[in-house]
């Protein structure tokens, strides 16, 4: 299995629109693309990323198919209008918490 790890900070003043996008567009559409969401963390204190999220696929080919899908590219571009310090990486799933 492979895991998509995403981290970002929500831009100040964008919180309401960001939450609306996250709940009404990003999460449902990513699930429809075939990504099984596994993690969603909100960091309130410290120097780390404000948001950490993850999702898995059965194999690398499925992950690559999702990430090359035009719908994913549109979602990612829209997410970038609400966030700073965006980071995306794909790793092999270890079963524990991954950064």
Per-segment meaning from a language model:
Residues 45-49:
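Short acidic/glycine-enriched loop/turn segments that link adjacent beta-strands
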Residues 2-8:
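Active-site-flanking beta-strand signature of metal-NTP-handling nucleotidyl enzymes
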Residues 14, 61-63, 96:
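Residue-level signal for secondary-structure boundary sites
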């Amino acid at each position: 299995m492979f895991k998509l790890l995403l981290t970002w900070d929500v831009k100040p003043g964008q919180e309401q629109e960001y939450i609306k996008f996250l709940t009404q567009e990003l999460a449902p559409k990513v699930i429809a693309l075939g990504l099984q969401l596994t993690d969603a963390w909100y960091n309130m204190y410290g120097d780390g990323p404000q948001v950490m999220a993850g999702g898995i696929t059965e194999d690398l080919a499925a992950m690559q198919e999702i990430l090359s899908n035009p719908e994913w590219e549109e979602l990612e571009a829209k997410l970038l209008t609400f966030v700073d310090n965006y980071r995306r990486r794909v790793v092999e799933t270890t079963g524990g918490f991954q950064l």
